[in-house]
Amino acid sequence: MRTFIKSHRRSSSLEACPPKTTPKRNSTGSPTELQPPVFPPSAPRQSSSFESLQKLTSGKLFSTKLFKKSGAQKLPATPDLPAFPRGYDSRSPSCEWRALGTEVALEDIPAIKGTRTHEWGENSDVSNSVIVLNRNSISSDGSYVETRDEQSPWRLARRSLDSATQTLSSTEEYSGPEIRIRSSTPHKLREASDSFLKKRWNRQARIHSKADIAKLEGSFPMPVEAISPPFARRRSSERSQCLGASGTMEQQLNPVNPEKCSLYAACSERSQSLTKATHALVATASTEVGLQNNLNSASVELRDDLENERESLSEEDSGSSFSDDSSKFSFEVGGGINGRTSSVKYYSKPDPPMRNYIDDLFEDEDFDEDMNCYDDDQEYEEDTEHLFGASHVQLEHGYSMMHEVTDSDSEQETKSNISSVLSKGQNAIFPSSDGRFVLNSGDSNGGSNQENIGVKMLEKSISNIGLEDVEDVEDDSDGIIPTDTQEDIDSPVHSQPSHANFSHIKKYSDIFGISDSDEDTANNSSSQYPFEEGYYSSDEEPTLRAEPAANTEDGFTDALKASFKQDESSHSSTDSIDKTPTFALDTDGEYFPPTLTLNKKSEVDDLDVSEEAAPESISLSTSDLEQPADAKQDRANIISSSIMDYAIHEVATTESVESDENQTTCVPQTTRVPSKVTKYADLFNLSDENDEDGSDGEFLDDMGFNELESTPVESKKPNIPPRRLGNEYFGNFHSPVASSHNAPAVPRQHSPLSAKVILPATENTSIKSQYAVPRMGQSPLPPPARSQTLKFHDLHSSLDGEIRGTMSNLFFIDESEEDQYYQVQSKVDDDYLDEINNVPEDFNFSDNDSDTCSGKSPMFPTGLRNSFRKTRSFSEKPTGLAKEPTPTRYKLDIKNKTVTFFKNGLSRPLSEGSLHGQSIPSRAHVPPLSLRKAMSEGSLEQSAHSPLGYGSLAFGLNSLKSPEMSRTDAYGLSPIQEAISSGDASPKLVN
């Protein structure tokens, strides 16, 4: 009895039946209204619980009486029974409409209908996407369908209203806001079941699980396509059919009072505000419920308004679903009744904005490498002022105006720097436009043309200086020597040629077409300028040029001309030599060439000097100048002595050097050719003898002599005339001036890339340091390296003077030859890669594969060959297919037996392992105690016929092995055959 009471309480709490006083309060109702509904016999009768049914059928507790009281035929005769019998399924969503038949207030509607998708923008309020909160179980819908007649479509629609899945899935009939219209059942019975209805609605507000959805699809008689896809917009034709059917049905409804009309209006407003015009307009009632004609018209008007609003919203939604395209979120809703999905997808813009990378701005925008913005006009103006001394306004008329632009500031600064180191009346020598040198005294008003200036200035300088003042002049005179730096002094003053001669220059490319004849014509026609200064464009700068033959009629000797000219043919063959002569001042204010050094290995040989080298002498073209014969030798001595100021570096000799009165010339020494280097491998064959000339040693400060070197162009010329120190002449020269001392001949050395001019060494020679701080803010020259020439490349820089060693030691190596040399000497890396790729990834590399102890010991079952087979990658030829990394299955299931493979590497006889010597066990694997006991006994029979402990196997009759001297090529696995009904052959543990 107690068990029955407990089961009864449990079922009552779930059903939440109304109190028994409910029929008593309904005293005014008719007897038909008080009767509970009659359920069809299709619903099977069940006991209240499984526990009570099991105990009652056992015959212990009043089985006959209890079954008679709980029968279905006793329900009409019992007036005090609750409205809902125990056998009724309380989870049925629509039983209240048939059982109670009362009006349900708005409180009965569940408070939560669903959640909306997250959107923003102007059209966020018009979206109709709803995430459905469904029931916890679907079995009630199936039971309801089984207990009701399934022919009425209105009951399907009514069930879809009660079920959250069917309501929001838009069934075939309607998709508007729901409005429930109830029958005229007494109000008192409805109030009694309010708590029960709320409890039921709260239980229905659940989200379907996948099991419920699968159960619903299998048990629900209505096709799934009728309610899928959810949230789909209804077509106008379907709406018209639904509205027509609803109007026909509404005419059959029972009339109601005006109070119910107001309740209907309130219900419609409340439902519309809750659902945002997304639910269906459905009229549900039983056969006993009806409406008046005015209610029919009101409901039709309400449906029309809702339909019009729905169409307008759908048009706006179809036009632009989202006002803000920066980001869109969408809840992906599955087809059918699967409800919502947990996936949230983000849709970015279809065309993202173009991103500006900084690399794209370098070519088109005004940015330097430090990402600093600058102005093109400002930079162009600064560049023109730096190069031409004029703004870009003066250059607007074309490239032809560039030839007439002068740099007045540079001109004044240059003349002031030169005049500060020249004595009064001395002249400066500047290159002309064709590469020739003219004398300039710094006075721009001295004449009207180049010829008058050259003659007058030269006559003035010669007349003021006599032969007896040569010693004084030599200390103050300046030599014109090209240097290898452009920073020592300002660039020469630009010339102003005739504008008519360059009128054909219209564009930048015309500058490259200017020939020497055009420049000569321009120089001859420019008589209105006070003097001709060296003109050259930015891409062709003035160079020292040579004439094919010497001209002795102009008053200048070949020695003077040789000091300023170079062979034009040699100049054309050596284009890579720097062609820009600049002028640098020595510490004492003298011009000197930086490429002239002294050779410590030079030896003085008594060689005859002939005058045959005179045609090769480089002369200065001054054909327009005519001087008296008396001044020729004086002028020659002055200029020659000034040129040699740097050549001897102010060598003060205490012992006189005797020179022959006869004219001497240089006799070249035998050429010394180093070892030929033709390829990269020849560099390793060079010996120390080839590096003798370019060996690293000390500088001039540690030597008593210097070595004069000239460029490869100057190697074809004889030596430069020497300078007279005191009353003695030092060195050899070719000059018509008679000398009372004999000078030994100076040998010359030749190399493929350089030529050395060697002067004889003298005793007690002291070198005056030339590295003191120069005057007038001029930068000092780099220290001349011993036995070296300037590096041979296109861009000349001051760093070349500091490179030690001769050019004979520098070789231009082809990179392809160097790569080929190393490819022959070493193995290609691809060969190693091929070998590595042929080895499987899971191959067990041992530390020492040749170790017999680790390869054949029973403690290490992985040998040389077994370690490779253990990888399970391949046993024959490697394949390039991807394989699953699944481990090897050691059990094979057949129909009648199961074969299991066990590793027997540790089950070998002790004598077999002892034949190879004692092995050291690994740290990772320690044999069990039973195995160690068996090994310590050393019995061959025991180890061969009895199991050896953990992991060992029970040998069969055919699995016995005799002791062997070497390991077999087996995989380390032995089979065990197990019968279906016998477990005797299974492995056993030995204690």
UniProtKB/Swiss-Prot annotation:
Keyword Kinase assigned: no
List the residue ranges of the region (Disordered): 1-51, 68-92, 165-192, 306-327, 516-546, 564-588, 603-631, 847-866
| Listed Acidic residues bias regions | 605-614
Q: Which UniProt keywords apply?
A: Cytoplasm, Zinc
Composition skew (Polar residues), residue ranges = 24-33
Alphabetical GO CC annotations of the entry are:
cellular bud neck; cellular bud tip; cytoplasm
Biased composition annotated in UniProt, kind: Basic residues: 1-11
Task: Give the top-rank taxon of the lineage listed in the UniProt record for this protein.
Answer: Eukaryota
Q: Where is this chain's protein located in or outside the cell?
A: Cytoplasm; Bud; Bud neck; Bud tip
General function of this protein: Involved in maintenance of polarized growth and daughter-cell-specific transcription.
**Family listed:** Belongs to the ZRG8 family.
Protein name, UniProt field = Zinc-regulated protein 8
Q: Which organism is it from?
A: Eremothecium gossypii (strain ATCC 10895 / CBS 109.51 / FGSC 9923 / NRRL Y-1056) (Yeast)
Name of the gene encoding the protein in the UniProt record: ZRG8
